[in-house]
Structures are given as C-alpha cells and as structure tokens.
C-alpha cells in the first residue's frame, strides 16, 4: 500500500522526468483557457502561433486584435521548490515580448499566474542586472559554463496576477475582463 509520502514523491518524480510533456500539456490548457475566455468576452479576432523551437526566446505568438505578443511560458508546481527561471535575452528583441510563469497542481490545474513584461509595443524590462544562467551539466573539468544569452529571473521579479482575467488584461490590454464576464452572465443566465 502506498503512503501519502510515497505518493507525493512519485508525483514529483513524474513531473521531473516528464517535464517537457508537462509543459506541452500546460501550454495547450493555457492557450485553450485564454481562447475560451476571449470567446466568452465576444473577442474573436485571435491567433496563436507556436515556435518549433526556442531559439528566439518565445514559445508562442499570441495575437488579439492589433496586439501581438511573443510569450515565453514557464511551468512549475505551485508548492515546488523552483525559485527562479532562465529567460532568453532574445525575447527582448521580439515585439512585446513577455514571460508568463504558470504554477500548476500535481494534476496540472493552473492555479498561479506570474507576469514579467511591459505594455504591448514596449520592450521587456532591462535584464542586464540579472545573473547569467549556467548550464545544468558541468564539463570535464567540473565547470558549469555560462549560457551567454540566458539570464536568471527570481520569482520576486515577477508580478503575481489574480488569475486568468488579469493575465489576459496584461497580454492584450483588455480591461476588466472579469467585470465584462459578470455583466454577460447577468444578462444571459
């Protein structure tokens, strides 16, 4: 019989060993949630493009109306130990680049939204004051080489958002998405 402690260790191991799959699943959930919410708000001019690989620092290009966002997504367990993430400096060159750090439960439910970015049309906040990231594996001499294009962002560099509506507001400057939904729900029970 499995104890609670064993179950937690097993879940954490599953998350660690399948992190790429986990990130793909959460990316699909996040995109679906954003598109569904925009649909509920009557906003239908939406496009989502996926990068084949992360050379330019973004995972998604999200367009809504005339706002285009290059988004790098990060995912971690809400009660996990992850205190920082690496950001590709190329993201600063992308139009309206931003990073969204999603906190998920063991069942991949998104419960936390963190934001690092600026208003649409503006560049990322300056990354020069942040430490340079290092490779996870050391070379033959035991040295972990620097990753010149990567900077470390601690959790404190991110703004914790109230939820999906505030995230959509940051991405696309759609004000008071939450209030619009309440009005819609009241008119259309």
Regions found by a protein language model. Give the residues of each.
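Mixed-charge (Asp/Glu-Lys/Arg
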Residues: 1-56, 61-189
């Amino acid at each position: 019989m499995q104890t609670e402690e064993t179950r937690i260790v097993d879940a954490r191991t599953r998350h660690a060993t399948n992190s790429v799959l986990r990130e793909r699943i959460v990316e699909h959930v996040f995109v679906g949630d954003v598109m569904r919410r925009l649909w509920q708000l009557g906003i239908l001019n939406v496009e989502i493009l996926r990068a084949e690989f992360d050379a330019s620092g973004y995972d998604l290009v999200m367009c809504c109306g005339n706002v285009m966002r290059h988004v790098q997504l990060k995912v971690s367990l809400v009660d996990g130990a992850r205190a920082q993430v690496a950001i590709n400096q190329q993201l600063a060159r992308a139009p309206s680049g931003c990073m969204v750090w999603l906190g998920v439960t063991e069942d991949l439910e998104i419960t936390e939204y963190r934001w690092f970015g600026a208003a649409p049309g503006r560049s990322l906040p300056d990354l020069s004051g942040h430490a340079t990231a290092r490779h996870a594996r050391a070379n033959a001499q035991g040295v972990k080489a620097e990753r010149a294009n990567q900077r470390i962002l601690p959790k404190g560099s991110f703004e914790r958002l109230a939820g999906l509506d505030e995230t959509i507001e940051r991405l696309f400057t759609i004000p008071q998405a939450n209030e619009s939904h309440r009005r819609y729900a009241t008119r259309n029970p």
